[in-house]
């Protein structure tokens, strides 16, 4: 299963293809997962995708799903995992490298040391509450909300009462040929 419209548009496939060329000879099921917040529409989409996956399982075939990062962190895989497990199929999670760990390695920085806290925040939602968190704040999956996130961060840095030293980094497509690295709010904007 590729969570994309086509194998050409699937980053995970393009990465695996480089180290495992025989994947090109395998049956591929391209199933784009919608990135929407409407719970009812999302559930219907997941059911439709899982039904297609289960058709293969009923034929006695083994099914795998490629994702970027770790399947346990904001991953489309977990929806399929739960559906398969609930239906009585064996479902296994193979850990990957979380994107924020890859980013920290790429930047040569530590996410947390000694008693420092690390917070992972889904940036597609309201992030204001997270401004009070101490330690490292990792905003993931900002997508269409990036401008809003940057505005909130800029306002927080201008507020004299809450101003503390903050290093702000951003990376898109970490480790890929189209990787972009940003240091500071000015570069991100």
Residue ranges and their predicted role:
Residues 25-30, 91, 120, 168-170:
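Conserved beta-strand scaffold positions in the cores of enzyme catalytic domains, especially
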Residues 60-66, 117, 136-138, 167:
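Residue-level preference for the first positions of well-ordered beta-strands
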Residues 46-55, 110-122, 187-189:
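A polyampholytic, Gly/Pro-enriched intrinsically disordered region
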Residues 2-5, 15, 131-189:
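A contiguous loop/helix-start segment that scaffolds small-molecule binding in enzyme catalytic cores
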Residues 1-89:
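Class I S-adenosyl-L-methionine
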Residues 72-133:
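Class I SAM-dependent methyltransferase SAM-binding "motif I" and its flanking Rossmann-like core
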Residues 7-9, 36, 98-101, 176-178:
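Short gly/pro/ser/thr-enriched loop/turn and capping motifs at secondary-structure boundaries
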């Amino acid at each position: 299963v590729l969570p994309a419209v086509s194998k050409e548009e699937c980053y995970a496939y393009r990465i695996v293809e480089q180290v495992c060329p025989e994947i090109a000879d395998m049956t591929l099921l391209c199933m784009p997962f919608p990135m929407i917040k409407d719970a009812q529409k999302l559930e219907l989409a997941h059911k439709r995708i899982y039904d297609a996956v289960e058709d293969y399982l009923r034929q006695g075939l083994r099914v795998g799903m490629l994702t970027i990062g770790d399947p346990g962190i904001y991953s489309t895989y977990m929806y399929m995992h739960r559906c398969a497990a609930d239906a009585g199929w064996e479902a296994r999670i193979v850990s990957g490298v979380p994107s924020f760990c890859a980013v920290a390695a790429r930047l040569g920085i530590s996410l947390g040391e000694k008693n420092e806290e690390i917070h992972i925040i889904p940036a597609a939602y309201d992030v204001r509450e997270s401004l009070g968190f101490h330690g490292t704040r990792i905003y993931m999956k900002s997508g269409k909300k990036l401008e809003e996130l940057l505005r909130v961060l800029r306002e927080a840095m201008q507020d004299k009462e809450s101003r503390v030293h903050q290093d702000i980094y951003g990376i898109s497509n970490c480790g890929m040929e189209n990787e972009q690295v940003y240091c500071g709010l000015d570069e991100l904007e």
